[in-house]
Amino acid sequence: MGFFGRLFGSKKQEKATPNRRRWSFATRSSHPENDSSSHSSKRRGDEDVLNGDKHAIAVAAATAAVAEAALAAARAAAEVVRLTNGGRNSSVKQISRSNRRWSQEYKAAMKIQSAFRGYLARRALRALKALVKLQALVKGHIVRKQTADMLRRMQTLVRLQARARASRSSHVSDSSHPPTLMIPSSPQSFHARCVSEAEYSKVIAMDHHHNNHRSPMGSSRLLDQWRTEESLWSAPKYNEDDDKILEVDTWKPHFRESPRKRGSLVVPTSVENSPQLRSRTGSSSGGSRRKTPFTPARSEYEYYSGYHPNYMANTESYKAKVRSQSAPRQRLQDLPSESGYKRSIQGQYYYYTPAAERSFDQRSDNGIAGYRGVSDGLDRNQSDKSKMYTSFFSSNPLFFQ
């Protein structure tokens, strides 16, 4: 506007200024030709001046236009620069915002993972503690059970040792008091004498039974003794008038009483007082007598034999083998009404008759008292120990009254 305003303003001024007559106070000359020439020169000078001004104005206007164009270009460049800088800043801001969001999400994921891992670790720790407690409980139960078993075994061992000591002490005390009645030199000779006595027809040996309180070691000991007994004794044949024995053995070791208590033993009045005997005599009244060998009682044999348990004694096969090798148990038949029981020092009840008692009294002067039972069988694999037992039986007492 300024450039065009100045341009049009100058034109208006040029139009507004008419050619006026210049006043001059100089004197007129008398030469008119000189005046006209001077006047034309002046006009030429004015035109030159006007042309110079116009050229200057045009140059100035062009310069101003260039300046305006440069200013506009500068403004445009500044705007471009501003716009460019704004885009970069926005992109940077967007990138920073995205980075912030990613960092926040990453931090949140890390927090969630750490919390979950802590939960899993605490859960695993609780499970491990529970497993350790369970293992401790199981081990404690097993240890307590083993300790209880060991204590029971120790108690059983102590009881057995006490019984063995008591048995040895009673044996020593009995050996210090020798008996008055002696066994004959051989069981066969004594048996021949007893057979001649018809009145002494029945001999019944019954042990005291405590089946509910016997120990496994005692049963194995008695099984071994019974096996040795079968190998020791050989039995001759008997007639119909031969003696028979009713054996009720409980397979439990018992202790012999001391000689001081032998006089105070209780003697039952009759055979019918025994429930074991009553159950066995019911079916023996109408049959004929069988020819059966004489079998010694296990408890009587135990009185002279040692205690030698066998680790195979508690098995069923061993018991069946022993039962198959042993003689069958006899039944009581035709007991006389005057017969009775008498108890020996081993705690057994023996059947006797008055005639047999008189015969024993007659033989007591000669020191004859013995054991009269031998079983009919083979003397299989008789060892040195069995021979020693045979010699021991031939030189030691068996019954005491």
From Swiss-Prot:
CDD domains noted in UniProt: IQCD
SMART domains for this protein: IQ
Stretches with biased composition (Low complexity): 165-176, 278-287
Keyword Cell membrane in annotation: yes
Pfam families: DUF4005, IQ
Renumbered residue ranges of the record's region Disordered: 1-48, 165-186, 258-296
Top-level taxonomic group: Eukaryota
Keywords from the UniProt entry: Calmodulin-binding, Cell membrane, Membrane, Nucleus, Repeat
Residue intervals of the IQ domain: 105-133, 134-156
Primary localisation category: nucleus
Keyword Repeat in record: yes
Disulfide bond sites: none
GO cellular component term of the entry, any: plasma membrane
GO molecular function, one term: calmodulin binding
Self-association and partners: Binds to multiple calmodulin (CaM) in the presence of Ca(2+) and CaM-like proteins.
UniProt function note: May be involved in cooperative interactions with calmodulins or calmodulin-like proteins. Recruits calmodulin proteins to microtubules, thus being a potential scaffold in cellular signaling and trafficking. May associate with nucleic acids and regulate gene expression at the transcriptional or post-transcriptional level.
Similarity field: Belongs to the IQD family.
Protein name: Protein IQ-DOMAIN 24
Organism: Arabidopsis thaliana
Lineage: Eukaryota, Viridiplantae, Streptophyta, Embryophyta, Tracheophyta
Gene: IQD24
